[in-house]
């Protein structure tokens, strides 16, 4: 299953992913997704996307550790985590609140 830079726009992403897990795909790939590494005790942060003005779009930044743990709990292990260089994403405006945010591709494999 391939999520091409879209899961961050799903309002109920965990419910949707649980439906996907029931299908038991061998691999699940996420590309172009923003993850934060701070010690903020939240699964997600909601941010406003401003590069498509005049439209207003909100999306999730995912807590990297919690996202990986959610998949592990649901029977999937992370086999690859790589920086996505297709788009230059500037996260500087989130400092000092978020020190480390990355635009990543993640590949999970069924255990």
Task: For each feature predicted by the language model, list its residue ranges.
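Acidic, Ser/Thr-rich peripheral helices and adjacent loops at domain boundaries
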Residues: 44-60
């Amino acid at each position: 299953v391939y999520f091409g830079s879209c899961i961050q726009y799903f309002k109920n992403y965990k419910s949707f992913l649980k439906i996907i897990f029931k299908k038991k795909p061998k691999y699940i790939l996420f590309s172009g997704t923003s993850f934060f590494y701070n010690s903020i005790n939240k699964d997600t942060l909601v941010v406003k996307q401003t590069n498509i003005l005049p439209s207003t779009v909100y999306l999730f930044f995912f807590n990297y550790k919690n996202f990986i743990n959610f998949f592990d709990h649901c029977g999937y292990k992370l086999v690859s985590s790589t920086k996505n260089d297709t788009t230059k994403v500037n996260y500087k405006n989130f400092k000092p609140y978020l020190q480390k945010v990355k635009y990543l591709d993640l590949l999970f494999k069924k255990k």
